[in-house]
Amino acid sequence: MIKIMFICHGNICRSPMAEFVMKDMIEKEGLSDRIFVSSSATSTEEIGNPPHRGTRKILDSLGISYDGKYAVQLKKSDYDDYDYLVCMDSYNIRNAARIIGDDPCGKLCKLLDFAGGGDISDPWYTGDFDLTYEDVKRGCEGLLKVLKK
């Protein structure tokens, strides 16, 4: 089974959006038995909190369930447990590396590395959850293409 961990700062906006958008794509492709998806934070600020209302609004509008999701922090052991550690921006990469240590297998990457490169803007600061969703969707589509090869 392929295991993917999406990572952002607080695990309430971008990474849970990516987690559930990707799960939806995987389910529609009939790959749920081959790919496992989760998400986590690099910080402890939001641990135990549900997804942000902006993320919930996007997921609700798409009919995508996020039941039972609460923010958790990335752990050092996640490096051994996951095949892909997919961050939303360069800041997340730096902070994730501080938690997991060395990356000899090259598991750390950014979601938009699968869709032309760049960072996914944090809607916590921009307030633009629609733009974040478009970037997340594009990145997840690119990642799924790689996984299906």
Regions found by a protein language model. Name each.
Residues S15, D89-S90:
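Helix N-cap/beta->alpha junction signal
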Residues D78, Y84, S90-K149:
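Phosphate-binding/catalytic loops
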Residues M1-D81, K145-K149:
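Conserved active-site segments centered on acidic
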